[in-house]
Amino acid sequence: MLTEQQRRELDWEKTDGLMPAIVQHAVSGEVLMLGYMNPQALDKTIESGHVTFFSRTKQRLWTKGETSGHVLNVVSIAPDCDNDTLLVLANPVGPTCHKGTSSCFGDASHQWLFLYQLEQLLAERKTADPTSSYTAKLYASGTKRIAQKVGEEGVETALAATVNDRFELTNEASDLMYHLLVLLQDQDLNLTTVIDNLRKRHQ
């Protein structure tokens, strides 16, 4: 969240008391929507943990999802370099747009969004009927079997590379990635955990 110093340095005068707030998906990086906050909306956002704007139409504070239940759970808030715009990282509950899409900017999705959506699907498969899909059956077979599949797909990926078969390498790498995501979900981990760890190693 914002530090006390960051909050004091926000330039409300420059924005006539209404500061643009860009909301971005905390996991996928997709830009979800743009709204405007006054100091009271920012305070309520921080206190409640749900993104709250000042509605220029309704002339009142408006918490995203207050009617639909599709709230935006705040992960972090950061000002830009001029202290006149906010970047809000949030995890959405349901679609963000009133039209039913994940973003108010249509289908111009971030490529990472597909992996996030795939992870969500895999998480649902964990508790599904084992007869309903290949993935649900794989979860039911247990961690050892899932780990074995990751090993098998890893070997097949490596073999495809050694014979310079780019088509087969792409297919095998896709299978490897899929089964690796299944294994991570099985262990209550996700791709974000891995990415965060890679960032730490890079620093």
Swiss-Prot record:
Keywords: Amino-acid biosynthesis, ATP-binding, Cytoplasm, Histidine biosynthesis, Hydrolase, Multifunctional enzyme, Nucleotide-binding
Localization, UniProt: Cytoplasm
Known pathway: Amino-acid biosynthesis; L-histidine biosynthesis; L-histidine from 5-phospho-alpha-D-ribose 1-diphosphate: step 2/9; Amino-acid biosynthesis; L-histidine biosynthesis; L-histidine from 5-phospho-alpha-D-ribose 1-diphosphate: step 3/9
SUPFAM superfamilies in UniProt: all-alpha NTP pyrophosphatases, HisI-like
Listed InterPro entries: His_synth_HisIE (IPR023019), HisE (IPR008179), PRib-ATP_PPHydrolase-like (IPR021130), PRib_AMP_CycHydrolase_dom (IPR002496), PRib_AMP_CycHydrolase_sf (IPR038019)
Uppermost EC category: hydrolase
GO terms, biological process: L-histidine biosynthetic process
EC number annotated for this UniProt entry: 3.5.4.19, 3.6.1.31
Segments for region (Phosphoribosyl-AMP cyclohydrolase): 1-114
Domain of life: Bacteria
One GO CC term, this protein: cytoplasm
Catalytic activity: 1-(5-phospho-beta-D-ribosyl)-ATP + H2O = 1-(5-phospho-beta-D-ribosyl)-5'-AMP + diphosphate + H(+); 1-(5-phospho-beta-D-ribosyl)-5'-AMP + H2O = 1-(5-phospho-beta-D-ribosyl)-5-[(5-phospho-beta-D-ribosylamino)methylideneamino]imidazole-4-carboxamide
Gene3D superfamilies assigned to the protein according to its UniProt record, in alphabetical order: MazG-like (1.10.287.1080), Phosphoribosyl-AMP cyclohydrolase (3.10.20.810)
Molecular functions (GO terms): ATP binding; phosphoribosyl-AMP cyclohydrolase activity; phosphoribosyl-ATP diphosphatase activity
Start and end residues of each stretch annotated as Phosphoribosyl-ATP pyrophosphohydrolase: 115-203
Primary localisation category: cytoplasm
Family: In the N-terminal section; belongs to the PRA-CH family. In the C-terminal section; belongs to the PRA-PH family.
Protein name: Histidine biosynthesis bifunctional protein HisIE
